[in-house]
Amino acid sequence: MRHRKSGRQLNRNSSHRQAMFRNMAGSLVKSELIKTTLPKAKELRRVIEPLITLAKQDSVANRRLAFARTGDKEVVGKLFNELGPRYEERPGGYIRILKCGFRTGDNAPMAYVELVDRPEVEEVVETEDAAAE
């Protein structure tokens, strides 16, 4: 029976799962938008939300906890220097999961995972004058 067993197994052993979510959390913090399968996205929420909540209070102890969970100094730096202050007033719900169709090949449901309130990247539109020069 699986009573009181939380979390998804995702057909992986525990060390593989832990490494996968550590890498996914790092990728999400660095790029602020990733594409993955829907079950992985839903499970990633359980990893990244407590990390951002931890980053709201900058202390050596919290930085060490975040490093223990991510294993990357660059990720910890961005968490505490950018994301913590950005979400200071938000009481949770730091990521958004958007369904984006199905993967070619195995038809797995795919989703975008993005940080809420992330800065919009403006696309550069070339005009005819700029293209001529």
From Swiss-Prot:
Protein name: Large ribosomal subunit protein bL17
Keyword Nucleotidyltransferase in record: no
GO biological process, one term: translation
Superkingdom, taxonomy of origin: Bacteria
PROSITE patterns: RIBOSOMAL_L17 (PS01167)
SUPFAM superfamilies membership: Prokaryotic ribosomal protein L17
Subunit structure: Part of the 50S ribosomal subunit. Contacts protein L32.
One Pfam entry name: Ribosomal_L17
Organism annotation: Pseudoalteromonas atlantica (strain T6c / ATCC BAA-1087)
Keyword Acyltransferase among UniProt keywords: no
GO MF terms held by the record: structural constituent of ribosome
Gene3D superfamilies, A to Z: Ribosomal protein L17
Key words of the record: Ribonucleoprotein, Ribosomal protein
UniProt signal peptide: none
Family according to the record: Belongs to the bacterial ribosomal protein bL17 family.
